[in-house]
């Protein structure tokens, strides 16, 4: 993490439980991010907060540290049953819940606290077996949590800490009734530590906070600009016929270390995956139709570097913290202005530089004025030479084909392979793009 992304507040100087401090130190957490530096002193006084912070600012570790510290410093409720968690963390998506759980497990290492995760799309019985053994911190999506509550598999009578992450996204997805259902089955707000985080503290989000929290302190880490200065944006105006060739040419020339390609529809994503896979790239596909186990595996492969490119719908645009994404390609301009910000926000994180390349084709160019109005600036236009686009593109792969597990096929354009080539030794660009350096 870049030092410029951190504050001067050390975790070691905060009044944290020794086991929490030990876990933080072992995982390289020395200085707080701004949202952590502002929120933790408030939370460590057992005061509720409504925090405004974007994904990637360190808010997850902020509420996890507060949750663990609160449970370790607070007596277990008298008469608590094994099926009653002490803390509940609600997330809008499965992917975000999984990411939160991974971070929670790091903090749990030296404690007696058990972490459990539940979400739809996974085996109901497998998750139930974990719950039957008892969990202290329950992380999950609201729908699956409600299923277990209604069946009496878990009870919320002993909840001492509550986290509502990505609250604005909860509204977007229509989960607010579920959230209120769960809040009504917990102890009163003044008997628990309540934390709400949202990219925007709109009136509806603030109303939710004041309805179900105990006079929350508002903590805001809102960027002055909607898009980071660390992200270099550019936009092309390709025809629909040249869109795919332009994308393949740009990827060929940029050879990004880790890239996400966004498209507006599942069908378009599948087509993109087929062309990229056929062109020899290590690429994963993430849409709503991909089975949950496969989605998890693809995200793990992309995070670990086994895949270089992730093709995704906006299911991956919110809530996922994937470090070191160097490039974001908007193959389609999104219909929602906020989705543009969330998409390109996958890169340029934690003080790192990033590239955002967008295509304004005939179908989606009409979305551009609203996007530029929303982000308060024009996106620089880049031109290209149609005759310089790759012409010898291999046949697209079939969608049911398995992803390769080996290294990327760094063949030359004549079709001869170079199996010994390594990722770091990729061939240089075939075509000059002087606009990059202008």
From Swiss-Prot:
Residue span of motif DEAD box: 165-168
Note down the stretches annotated as region Disordered.
395-438
EC identifiers of the protein: 3.6.4.13
Listed GO biological process terms: RNA catabolic process
The Helicase ATP-binding domain sits at 40-219
Name the positions where ATP binds. Answer: 53-60
**Comp. bias (Basic residues):** 428-438
An example Gene Ontology CC term for this record: cytosol
Keyword set, alphabetical order: ATP-binding, Cytoplasm, Helicase, Hydrolase, Nucleotide-binding, RNA-binding
Q: Which reaction does it catalyse?
A: ATP + H2O = ADP + phosphate + H(+)
Q: Name one GO molecular function term.
A: ATP hydrolysis activity
Per UniProt, the short sequence motif Q motif occupies residue numbers 9-37
- Superkingdom, taxonomy of origin: Bacteria
Localization, UniProt: Cytoplasm
Domain (Helicase C-terminal) spans 243-390
Under the subunit heading, UniProt states: Component of the RNA degradosome, which is a multiprotein complex involved in RNA processing and mRNA degradation.
Q: Which family does it belong to?
A: Belongs to the DEAD box helicase family. RhlB subfamily.
Role? DEAD-box RNA helicase involved in RNA degradation. Has RNA-dependent ATPase activity and unwinds double-stranded RNA.
Protein name, UniProt field: ATP-dependent RNA helicase RhlB
Q: What is the gene called? A: rhlB
């Amino acid at each position: 993490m870049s030092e410029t992304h951190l504050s001067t507040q050390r975790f070691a100087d905060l009044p944290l439980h020794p086991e929490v401090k030990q876990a933080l130190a072992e995982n390289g957490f020395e200085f707080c991010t701004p949202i952590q530096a502002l929120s933790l002193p408030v939370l460590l006084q057992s005061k509720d907060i409504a925090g405004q912070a974007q994904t990637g600012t360190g808010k997850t570790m902020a509420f996890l540290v507060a949750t663990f510290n609160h449970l370790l410093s607070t007596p277990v409720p008298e008469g608590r049953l094994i099926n009653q968690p002490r803390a509940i963390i609600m997330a809008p998506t499965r992917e975000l819940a999984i990411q939160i759980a991974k971070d929670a497990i790091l903090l749990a290492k030296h404690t007696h606290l058990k972490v459990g995760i539940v979400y739809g799309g996974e085996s109901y019985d497998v998750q139930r077996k974990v719950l039957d053994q008892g969990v202290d911190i329950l992380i999950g999506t609201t729908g699956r949590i409600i299923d277990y509550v209604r069946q009496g598999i878990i009870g919320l009578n002993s909840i001492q800490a509550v986290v509502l992450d990505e609250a604005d996204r909860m509204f977007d997805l229509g989960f607010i009734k579920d959230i209120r259902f769960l809040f009504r089955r917990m102890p009163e707000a003044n008997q628990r530590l309540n934390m709400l985080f949202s990219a925007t503290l709109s009136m509806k989000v603030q109303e939710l906070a004041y309805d179900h929290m105990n006079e929350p302190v508002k903590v805001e880490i809102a960027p002055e600009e909607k898009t980071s200065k660390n992200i270099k944006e550019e936009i092309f105006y390709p025809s629909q016929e040249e869109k795919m060739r332009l994308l393949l040419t740009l990827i060929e020339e940029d050879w990004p270390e880790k890239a996400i390609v966004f498209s507006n529809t599942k069908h378009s994503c599948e087509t993109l995956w087929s062309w990229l896979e056929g062109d020899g790239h290590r690429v994963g596909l993430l849409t709503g139709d991909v089975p949950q186990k496969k989605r998890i595996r693809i995200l793990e492969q992309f995070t670990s570097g086994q895949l270089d490119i992730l093709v995704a719908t906006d299911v991956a645009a919110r809530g996922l913290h994937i470090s070191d994404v160097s490039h974001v390609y908007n193959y389609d301009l999104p219909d929602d202005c906020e989705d543009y910000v969330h998409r390109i926000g996958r890169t340029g994180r934690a003080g790192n530089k990033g590239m955002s390349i967008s295509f304004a084709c005939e179908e989606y160019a009409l979305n551009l004025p609203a996007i530029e109005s929303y982000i308060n600036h024009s996106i620089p236009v880049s031109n290209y030479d149609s005759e310089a686009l790759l012409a010898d593109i291999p046949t697209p792969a079939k969608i049911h084909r398995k992803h390769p597990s080996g290294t990327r096929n760094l063949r030359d354009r004549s079709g001869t392979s170079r199996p010994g080539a390594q990722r770091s030794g990729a061939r240089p660009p075939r075509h000059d793009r002087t606009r990059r350096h202008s």
